[in-house]
Amino acid sequence: RLREQAARDSGTPERAAGLLQGCDAAMRDLYSPLWSSLPAQGPLVIGHIGQSLDGFIATDAGESRFVTGRDNILHMHRMRALCDAVIVGAGTVAADDPQLTTREVPGPNPLRVVLDPRRRLSAQHRVFRDGEAGTLLVQGQGASAADIEGVESLRLTDGEGLDLRALLHALHARGCRRVFVEGGGRTVSAFLEAGLLHRLQVTIAPLLIGSGRPSIRVRGSVSLADCLRARHRVFRMGSDVLFDLDLAERGDGAKPGTDLTGMDRIL
């Protein structure tokens, strides 16, 4: 596995050049931090969320495919191909049954990491049985369900939820230098609250859902001066708009890896 990882890491810009054929200069620039901004310690962690104008990722009935358009779907597949691991929560797997592969673009599949603290997912979901890529099931120490045959399992302390820092350390130890946190809202929010994201991509679709499953939710600010502000870039994704936030130098003075709230765990 580590030898395979080294092969992925060597020549990343060259691999990206083939993957990004047909993309304009602006889109190519969106992906440049994946090889130009690797931290000295630990993996580069990039979060992504696709939402409506009014901040929802799904309807009240749970319908979420697809809030954003085709261009953003291709973008997520490129991100998977350029990263070593893709992380999703159990809610995303239960609602969407995603494959988390790179079937829409030329490029390697990442390690699929599913966070399921209480082991409520069945073995019937595609990430556990399709054999398209490796899957790591992350669950709490207290989860009582049996492991899933053919799926690697990692148990983490779960006094108040999964220890996300320990997860990133484990992924880095196995050679994952780029980690893509793809969803859903609770999972991305947990990484953001803990100060574990280096970048955050928010793709906004031109539609209003009205009510439903919320997008990012973080601790509220008493005043605008206390809000998290970050340098950002804006990219067109067809009819959608993607905001790429650089959290390496946050407006609140914190840097990735700084625990702002103690909430570096996910329920």
PLM regions: where:
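Enzymes that bind and transform nitrogen-containing heteroaromatic metabolites
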Residues: 1-267
